[in-house]
Design a protein with these regions (language model features):
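Charged, glycine-rich active-site and insertion segments that engage polyanionic ligands
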Residues: 1-82, 86, 90-160
């Protein structure tokens, strides 16, 4: 229903409406904020971030933290929300509940590959770390410090 509303009433293209609907999780107000914000490529940003974390490429994580710091608060929140949603999708994939997955296309391909290296314990720990980072961001902590700290902790979690 929300996706149809965004397409019909707001004139948003189908692929973008699907992404917004997935992020908003039924919250119309949040979906409208996402629709009004500039198009950002959370999927690509997340994929690059997780690859750097998995490879423990700490040198590339510093510029990523600087880029994250340069985003506005809504974009930072959107990336964290997106990251948490991908962890959820990965958990569903590992659990065999693929009929509940909302991902499509390249995002689904990444989740299929990502689920091969993730375990329930890694997802639980990553989810907790991301929620903690989101909490600190909401309390106006330094986005660069929070993102870099989260990245290092995720690198240790994903590839111990």
């Amino acid at each position: 229903e929300l996706e149809a509303f965004l397409i019909n009433q707001r004139g948003i293209e189908v692929a973008r409406a699907a992404k917004i609907t997935s992020l908003a999780e039924g919250n119309v107000n949040y979906a409208l904020k996402l629709a009004e914000s500039d198009e950002d490529d959370n999927a690509q940003r997340f994929i690059e971030w997780m690859r750097a974390c998995f490879k423990k490429n700490y040198i590339s994580l510093v510029p990523m933290a600087e880029d994250y710091h340069a985003l506005d608060k809504l974009q930072q929140k959107n990336l964290m929300t997106y990251s948490i949603n991908v962890m959820r999708e990965t958990l569903l994939r590992i659990s065999g509940a693929t009929d509940m997955n909302r991902s499509r296309g390249d995002e689904l391909k990444f989740i299929q590959d990502f689920s091969k290296v993730m375990t329930l314990e890694k997802i639980e720990k990553s989810f907790t770390l991301m929620n903690d980072a989101n909490y600190h961001l909401e309390r106006n902590g330094s986005a660069k410090m929070i993102f870099l700290d989260l990245s290092i902790k995720l690198a240790r979690t994903i590839n111990p």
